[in-house]
Amino acid sequence: MRPSLVRLVRPRRPERKTSPILPPLKLYKALLRAHANKLPVELRPLGDQYVKAEFKAHKNIDNPLHIVGFLAQWQDYLKGIDGGEWINGKLSQQDLEKMSPEQIGQLHELMEEAKKAGASE
């Protein structure tokens, strides 16, 4: 039996399993839009301030690996917000092990601010 023409044709390049990374400005605007549409009103200012501060802090980074990692992580966060996964989201031990001490400190500060916001209700 001869193979069909469809089986002989191969794709020109492999398919991506992940979506391409959004440009920084589009990602930034999409994050703020997602906060406006998906987050509860009391959490929106906290989320917006954090996104703005992080993008401002990483504005002058020159290392392409850091840029790609930064944008990829924020894009994953955006998918979580859009999908509603943020409500029950948990950080795995593997993710914690990958973090630098500075990042763990930032995470702790974020946790404390979230607790303050929750206690003020």
From Swiss-Prot:
**GO BP terms:** carbon utilization; gluconeogenesis; mitochondrial respiratory chain complex II assembly; regulation of gluconeogenesis; succinate metabolic process
- Source taxon at top rank: Eukaryota
Alphabetically sorted, this entry's keywords are: Chaperone, Gluconeogenesis, Mitochondrion, Transit peptide
Which cellular component terms (GO) are annotated to the entry? mitochondrial intermembrane space; mitochondrial matrix
Compartments annotated for it: namely:
Mitochondrion matrix
Q: Where is the transit peptide?
A: 1-35
| Pfam families found in the cross-reference section | Complex1_LYR_2
Q: How does it associate, per the subunit comment?
A: Interacts with the iron-sulfur protein subunit within the SDH catalytic dimer.
Give the UniProt family note: Belongs to the complex I LYR family. SDHAF3 subfamily.
What does this chain do?
Answer: Plays an essential role in the assembly of succinate dehydrogenase (SDH), an enzyme complex (also referred to as respiratory complex II) that is a component of both the tricarboxylic acid (TCA) cycle and the mitochondrial electron transport chain, and which couples the oxidation of succinate to fumarate with the reduction of ubiquinone (coenzyme Q) to ubiquinol. Promotes maturation of the iron-sulfur protein subunit of the SDH catalytic dimer, protecting it from the deleterious effects of oxidants. May act together with SDHAF1.
What is this protein's record name?
Succinate dehydrogenase assembly factor 3, mitochondrial
